[in-house]
From Swiss-Prot:
Protein family membership: Belongs to the MTC1 family.
Protein name: Maintenance of telomere capping protein 1
Pfam families referenced in this protein's UniProt entry, alphabetically: DUF5427
Organism: Schizosaccharomyces pombe (strain 972 / ATCC 24843) (Fission yeast)
Biased composition (Basic and acidic residues): 27-38, 296-305
Keywords: Cytoplasm
Amino acid sequence: MAETKEQTDDVETLMASLDQLGMEADPTSKEFNNDDSKIGAPSEVQDEKELLEFLDQLENDEEKNEKNPIEEANEENESVAATSNERQQHDASNQPSQAAQTTINKNTESATPKTVNEINKSQEFQEHVETPKQSNWLGGFWSTASAAVRSAEQRVRSIKGFEENANWDINVRNMVDLNKLGDLSNGIRSKALPTLSNTIHNVLNVVAPPIHDHEVLQVTVFHDLAGFAHLDRIVYESFEKVMFQVEGGELTVLLDKEAKVRPRTNDVYEDFGLCNGYLEAKKLAKANLAEPITEAKKMNKENKQENVGAGDDEDASESPMVRVTHLLLVIQAFTIKNKEVSDDEQLCFLIHLNDTNHNLEFSTTSQPLPLEWQRWAVDPRYIKLFGSNAILPNEWVTEWVEQSISVAAGIVAQMYTSKRMALGDPSLFAGLPEEDVNTGSSETPVPYYDGAMYA
């Protein structure tokens, strides 16, 4: 009887524990069936247990439909903890059998991993729900960052373009000499523009030509100076400055065909063809121009005959006649000794101009230069002393010689132009009222100073 009573108590204890573990255990699992088969309870107890499990399963299905996975997992954890506490208290008071204790432990162990798995699934479900929100936030942040990067790249490209333009501008300024550009612009302004304006002016004057406006001044330069190859250009620039004072007319400067540029030697007298004194230089200049003057006068006669024969054609066509005036200019070097200025010998240049068309002659002299400079210019010892890269005397001596000739040629050009304009002639003021005429105008005019230096 005692054994039967103990078995009955064990069965009641088992039924109480099954009521509490019904929500956790799976009624269809093989482990639960295997544990029950190991206990060896009667068939009635087995039927009652199956009925209770069926009822518990229905309750679990209803609760799962109403609760979320997180709450269900929390309740299962609480139920597992409560069941374990009650079982420990019951085992301590009643001391259940080894078989019942083994069954409870197995059921608890089988239920606990399942509860942990459900908790993990619930966490995965929550992460899956939160993932779209995070992905949307990350997508918006990424698009904003991409737009900022693109705008920054465009700004960098624009700044880089400005830097490249600045560098290009610096490189161009380094490659091109601005001083040379300034000289070029001045040359265009002083040479090309006047020539162009004169050309346009001549074209317009074909319709209504002014008097004495269609005239070409053809200057031929003669000299015997060694080492000076640009004297024709110097004479042209000097005459051009003076020609700006006169409306109309054209200017051409030619170099004598027989004039040859000779290299300089150590003999200064030979290099410059020096003669002694102004009078000897003037005689030599006129002698050198004797033959060219004869040829020029011959050409003038031929041109006059052609102009007379073409008079009728001119009236028919009403086209102006272009006159060519031949000017012969000779440059002659000579030496002087002026004790009032210096005891050393001085170098001067005589500039003599002859107009064969109007029978006009003008002469002047240049600024005296120390003749010793010319000896320095041809002395090779200065090259050995200072080196070829230094500024040697021949460079600045040549520059001073060209400047002195340029000034003298300009003075001769101004004298010639003033004479052609009848400046200083009393008849020029004949048409003015008497009150505007100077009282000294009736006097004889002062003769021109020819620029000669007399010893």
